[in-house]
Amino acid sequence: MKQNPAKTARMWIIICLLFVLGQATDNDRDFKMCGKWLHGIAPQNLEYDLKTGCERIEISANESTLSIQGRITAKCTQSSSIQLDSNPHQNQSHFCVFWEPLLDLLIVEVNGKNHTLCKPNGLQGTCCTDLSQGVQDNAHMYGIVNGSVKGDIITGDLKGNYIFDGAHINCKEKFCDEARLKPRGANMIEEVVMRFNAKGRVDLPCAQGTVIEMDEEFTGHNFTVPAPRFVDANTIPSVYIPSSLRSVSRRKSKVVCTYYKNKTLFERGPSKSALLDDIVGLSVENETIRNLIEPVKIRFHHRPFAPDSSGRCVSWDTKQDNEVNWKDDGCDTVKINEEQTECHCNHLTYFAILVQVEQKSTVRHLKALTFITAVGCAVSLVSCLVLFYWLCKRRRGKKNQISLVHRGLVVAIFLLCLFFILTGILANVANETVCQLTGSLLHYGLLSTLCWMAMEVFHTFLLVRKVFNSPLPIWIFYLMGFGFPFLLVSILLSVGDIYGERKIKPSDDVNNPYRMCWMTEGDKSQLAHYIINIGLLAVVVSSGLVMLFLVVREIRNRPDWKKIHVAFLSIWGLTCLYGTTWALGFLDFGPFSEVTLFLFCIINSLQGFFLMLRYYALERMKKKDVSSSDGSSSGSSKQHMLQTNEKS
């Protein structure tokens, strides 16, 4: 007779699965035996007699009594009887026996109601488990039918009792081995420590924990996490839990802190970053904690980081992410010194220090560049106020279009410098909403400055080439200089996740970044930066260079052009006016990148000051021209070279 290959293959698969499942059941630490108890209509009782040891447990049933007796506990010794809720119209009850040897916990459930025969009594080292099935006695009318272990039916026949023989194992080690195989094994450890029926220290081979009780008088607590004996006490993390952690609606609640010196439960795939060895987990019993008013503080001890590396506080929320996913959301990194870093976090989960090599994302001489730019912006602020006053005073009584265009540029530069100074301050003291608003205003100031420089180029082009017979209305310039940037920023605000806190890390101290309110480092922000900022800057710089070339070509044959100071002032004044100094931003590479960066910060932060100097030079030349007795054209030609599009 021929065998069917498909049937043969299926049989082998079933046999293999049964073998694997059988092995898993035999080796599993916890025990669960269920069945249907057939009894009479008289009142029922649950009797139990439990003693310490590791021999056997017998589960039996008759007309009125369900009995649990044996020697399997580590510390629990209990013997008593419990009267069960009975229904005279029902002659059967479903029951389950749960045995957790690690906690020395034994619970019997009858018709959905739990009866705890042995309460949790610490975490047991050596315990009695691996309960293997022994003999069963048959019954005739009353007893247990459909007996099962962890869902697997033992027999459907009516039995009077079930006997299971136990064996000693190291429960803590086996529990840790099981946790290491689970995707979120740390949750298993945290749950076991949470169920630890006492306050204080809990020791496992894979983790150490402590249970802290918060009552109505809880005002915060500082403590050092428990650690293995072989670890130096001076290197153990310390934790501060604030009073805001306690729930007002609950009189008492437990905080569990778990400490892992071995990071195998938390490692992810290949990455350019690496976790430090210390992992700290924090949780509150039956609660999800987020957005704390006062943060929890975890201080880690470590060796000094390499010059090109930084350590930042990260957390893994195992309730949201099934796989290891370390994020810095909700955590601030505070550098205490070279060997201590403190994490301030507004939520509870697992925390660690992630060390990264960040050569490309750091800036050399950041403190010096920041100081230079801040001083330059402060000087430009004052210069813009003075220049705006001069322009208004000079043109009072006659609305000159050139003066109005200049005023627009002066106001834009003033806004840019003002918000640049404020952004570093507000990033450290203001909330997220204020920082987003400040970042958008700083971006508006930058775009408005670039647009007004483009308007200066366009206005000069109209005057030099005389494209139109009559000048364009001034509102067109103001619409493009102030309205167009407002439209762009409004669109970015509506998109969301564009503006916020930005951290710029100095190369000599990557753990102490400069905070500013600007465009964030997200993908959407980077896309907007390259399209809008870089795109507009490229247009302004290229058009400014072209216009500068055309103007210089037109005036280079004038008599006074040969005087060096006049030529220099002409080119420099127009360069600032047309925004061509921003071209230095495209030259930040190669061996002279640091020099270029310093020049970029110095020149562009002082742009308001240079424009004021340009205007002052024009006024002096105008006065000399007026006071000239012979009426020569020398002064006017100088003025024309500095300001080809301004008519006095």
From Swiss-Prot:
It is a multi-pass membrane protein. The keyword Translocase does not apply. Residues 25-370, 430-443, 493-530, 587-595 are extracellular. Its main location: membrane. Disruption phenotype: Fishes are more active. Hypomyelination characterized by a reduction of mature oligodendrocyte number and myelinated axons. InterPro entries: GAIN_B, GAIN_dom_sf, GPCR_2-like_7TM, GPCR_2_secretin-like, GPS. Disulfide bonds join 34-96, 127-176, 313-343, 331-345. It is found in: Cell membrane. Residues 349-361 are annotated as: Stachel. Forms a heterodimer of 2 chains generated by proteolytic processing that remain associated through non-covalent interactions mediated by the GAIN-B domain. In the inactivated receptor, the Stachel sequence (also named stalk) is embedded in the GAIN-B domain, where it adopts a beta-strand conformation. On activation, the Stachel moves into the 7 transmembrane region and adopts a twisted hook-shaped configuration that forms contacts within the receptor, leading to coupling of a G-alpha protein, which activates signaling. It comes from the Eukaryota. GO terms for biological process: adenylate cyclase-activating G protein-coupled receptor signaling pathway; cell surface receptor signaling pathway; myelination of posterior lateral line nerve axons; oligodendrocyte development; peripheral nervous system myelin maintenance; regulation of oligodendrocyte progenitor proliferation; Rho-activating G protein-coupled receptor signaling pathway; swimming behavior. Keywords: Cell membrane, Disulfide bond, Glycoprotein, Membrane, Receptor, Signal, Transmembrane, Transmembrane helix. PROSITE patterns: G_PROTEIN_RECEP_F2_4, GAIN_B. Residues 1-24 form the signal peptide. Residues 214-361 form the GAIN-B domain. Belongs to the G-protein coupled receptor 2 family. LN-TM7 subfamily. Heterodimer of 2 chains generated by proteolytic processing; the large extracellular N-terminal fragment (ADGRG1 NT) and the membrane-bound C-terminal fragment (ADGRG1-CT) predominantly remain associated and non-covalently linked. The Stachel sequence (also named stalk) in the C-terminal part of the extracellular domain (ECD) functions as a tethered agonist. In the inactivated receptor, the Stachel sequence (also named stalk) is embedded in the GAIN-B domain, where it adopts a beta-strand conformation. On activation, the Stachel moves into the 7 transmembrane region and adopts a twisted hook-shaped configuration that forms contacts within the receptor, leading to coupling of a G-alpha protein, which activates signaling. This is Adhesion G-protein coupled receptor G1. It comes from Danio rerio (Zebrafish).
